[in-house]
């Protein structure tokens, strides 16, 4: 077979594209559970950081257990303040909820107790200069004083 002919070059390129495509697809599918677990742990770290557990001192492995200990109360709230049954607050995507009409939205509320005081953590999301910004703010019991905040964004400045 003459490796300098166009037929060989196109066949070789096609085979390489198919092989690499199959490998990448397989890797993406097999790594998806690990990616989702990392996103979940990072979200827990972000929420924990608002009530005094900095990310630098709370490894992801510890954040999973600590989150359950710190936030004994979690609610999915409707617009009227009533509790939405059957919905896990941690699984709520604020980006998806904001696309719904106000009457259909469900928002998470996390309640922690630290040093005998209840802290209420609420999520935030909005538009930044280059893309969406999201975060969490913890409020003291009076609901007027901010105890802590954590913000993040998807991309760097272009």
Language model regions located:
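Flexible, solvent-exposed loop/hinge segments and secondary-structure transition points
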Residues: 2-158
